[in-house]
Structures are given as structure tokens and as C-alpha cells.
Amino acid sequence: MKKLLGIFFISLLLSVNAYADSVYNGTFIDAHSQVGKLITDETVSKIINKNDVDLTLLSIRGKWKTATQRYKSIQRLTQNKTRYLIPTKLRGFSRKKQSADRAIKGIEDLKKQAIKNNINYVGFGEIIVQHAPHNHKKLKYEGINNDLNSKRIVRAIDIVLKDNKPVILHVELNDYEEDSKKILGQLVKLGKKYPNDNFLLMHMAQIEFTEAEFIINETNNIHFITSHADNERAERMKKKPGRSQMGWINLFDKKNNFQKKWLDLMNQNPKRFVLALDNVWDRHWFNGYKERIYMWRKALASLNSDAASLIACGNAKSYFKLNIECLKDRK
């Protein structure tokens, strides 16, 4: 497996010179990544500082009592190259046995913690609605399958909307395919119930192309976060079945170019896609981060310039109300 991933990343590196003139050089925002206890503030800050991402929206994993302390440390060490997303899952929100009241109190406590520490947070991290079981040495997880009408989900969404922030939802339409039609219908109803708010689907919700067209046609405010919808994730899924999610989608062809149908959909509906890398584990920061950034910059260059700028920067700026200039070319 490591050998295959190594070949994947080497192929990306070797292609840098060949595509030097067709790499997107505009402002690049990673609209959702995470830092956990397996990587230090100093280490992740060094990685952020030396790579070509202009701004990272960051949520903290691990101990909830030190979440804001960790974020402030990283923000200082990166010289303000990060913005804070209040974590939603640190106190058992995505655990079946955790009561909804305690899970919601966890989010409220983390918001109070951020305010007390004078952190100008720009939003909240992903709300886990559905998540497949995880069988890995670093995480044993029984999975969870809520829907958008579940008590804790409704209350979490309400907290975010009352703060006038975009709602990031983690649903897995393929891993829970038996419920996909229900979830799609609930998403449409949610978008229409709150027409002036924005909802972002993490990892593009494992959505199939026809389902994405359906969401775009039926709503104006349900958008897609691009994280983990690529060849690297597809290879891991193929070689290590059964350890975690198996429903990942892939926007790319074998040469790391956008598949034409997705390319066309992005060009036609650029305000519906938000770029994010979603580094979760320490390995996401240590292994292949630079190559993933390059892969996305190369892919963005294949879009028309307005679409590329919106997906890479403009949409995140608008939805999260970020104070950043979205340049099409930083030269």
C-alpha cells in the first residue's frame, strides 16, 4: 500500500515541471482541516508555513479543555494563516451512547471557551450526521447513522444558524446507501426552510453525479466541500477495505485531471463548490500534503478563471465572511 501511494505522489512531483504553466496561482483557502493530539502545535505550524495554502480554517481534535489554547498557539506560530472553526465533536457528539443534551452542551461550552479567549471564530467544524464504523489502531469507532431530523443534529444546526455561520454537515450517502434517498430529501427541505443560510456537505457527502445535479437543481444554498474526493482516497479504499468508509467518490481521472462531467458541473455552477483538504490525522499533514496542494492547483487551472477563483477562495470568503483578498494570480 505504501509503495502504491509512493508511486502516486512521485508521479505528481514529476509532473510539476511539465505543468508549470498550467497550475493555478491564485489565493487558495483550505476551508476545513483538523489538528489532533498526534501532532504538536509547532510541527503543524511549520508544515502550514512552508506550504502553498494562503489560509486554513482549522478545527481542533483531542482534549476539549485545551482546544482554544492549541488554536491560539497555532495561529501565533503561523502568523495568522489560520481561522478557527469551533469543534462540534469533542465531547462525544458522534458517539451513540452519548446523550444529546451532553453532546450539545459540549458545543456550547467550546463556544464560550472561544469567546472567553477572544478568538474571532469564523464558523463551526463539521457536524457528524452519519459516519461509517472505523476499525483502525488509532481509532475504534462503532459508527453512527442519524438523519437531519435527529434531536442532536437539529439542535447543533440551530446553534450554528443562530450564530449566522455556514453549517458543515458530514453525511455519507454511499456508506449508508439505504438511507440516501431520505437524506437527499431532507437536505432539500433544509435548504428551502433556511433560504438565506448556507449548508456545506463535507467530502461532497459521497454524492453521485446525478445526485449532485439534483441538489444543485433543487436548492440554491446546499454546497459541496471537495475534501477526500480524489485518487489518493480511492487507492486507500481499494487496498484496505473494511477499515473505515468505503463510499468515497472521485472527482478525478487516473491522470489527476477532473473528470469531464465534474469539470463541466463546476464551470457551470462555481458557487456550489468549496475547496478543502481536510487533514484529519497526523499522516495527512506529514505525508503527501504538498502533493495534494499541487494536485488541486493543477486541477483548478483546468477550470475557467472565474470558477477556479470562486472554488479556491471566493466561496469560502463569502460563506465564512473572511477578510481576505481573492487574487486570481498572486504574482
Across the structure, where does each feature detected by a protein language model lie?
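Active-site gating/metal-coordination segments in enzymes
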Residues: V23, Q69-D175
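Acidic (Asp/Glu)-rich catalytic clusters
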Residues: S45-D52, R70-R83, D109-N120, A156-K162, ...
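Structural recognition of the beta-strand scaffold that forms the well-ordered cores
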Residues: T27-A31, D54-I60, R83-T88, V122-E126, ...
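Bacterial N-terminal signal peptides
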Residues: G6-S15
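Mid-to-C-terminal alpha-helical segments outside catalytic/metal-binding sites
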Residues: K2, A20-I29, V35, I39-L55, ...
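Acidic-and-aromatic substrate-binding clefts and catalytic sites of carbohydrate-active enzymes
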Residues: H32-D41, I60-Q69, F93-K105, D147, ...
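Catalytic pocket-lining loop regions of alpha/beta-barrel enzymes
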Residues: L139-V274, N323, L327
